[in-house]
Amino acid sequence: MQRSIFTLALLSTLALAAVPAAAAVDFGAEVVSRYVWRGTDVGNAISIQPGMSYNFSSVEIGAWSSWAINGGSANENNLYVSFTTGPVAIAITDYYFPAFTANDRFFRYGDGDAVHILEASASLARVDMPISLICAFNFSGDTENSFWIEGTYDLGEMDETAVSVTVGAGNGSYTTDTDPNLVSVGINLGKADYFASYILNPDKESTFLIFGKNF
């Protein structure tokens, strides 16, 4: 079933020659000084992060990846499907971590190989409210079935720079002892195509200052 879902997603994305007039496609990339994901430095290197998406009505199918420039460390190549109704979005994401070995073939799924992690998530974001929320749960590929919850508060603009604060907590693979804990507190700035974040992980007692640019 899992394999069928994402095979269908791939076929739908590749069928762009028959895109209806109401549909839209998009692509882009980011370059970041470090790839910090939910309070953890994933690659310990500058990373290039391309993405592409196909939107039709309330459905979006897309791919997003992160590639470290230090010779293949912490590569990630994800697929996702999302459905949005009003301020609520429901998504399934396939996190795939290719290391280019015989044990990380794309169609290997399950809790035992750790090459794919499948996540279900729900998010809430209203244009008339400064707060957005996301809850996520790993239902395959993660023996801990880790749970994540995150909130972002938009503080508005200062000197033409968007300012927000993000707080995230999780358990399982997100924490040092698998128990629920606060693992990410960040201050985020964005101006034009540039962005920066200062992130504290209270659980690991580590901090990061990252900078990036959108293309």
Question: What is the predicted function of each stretch?
Answer:
Residues 22-215:
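Outer-membrane beta-barrel proteins
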Residues 1-26:
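Cleavable N-terminal export/targeting peptides
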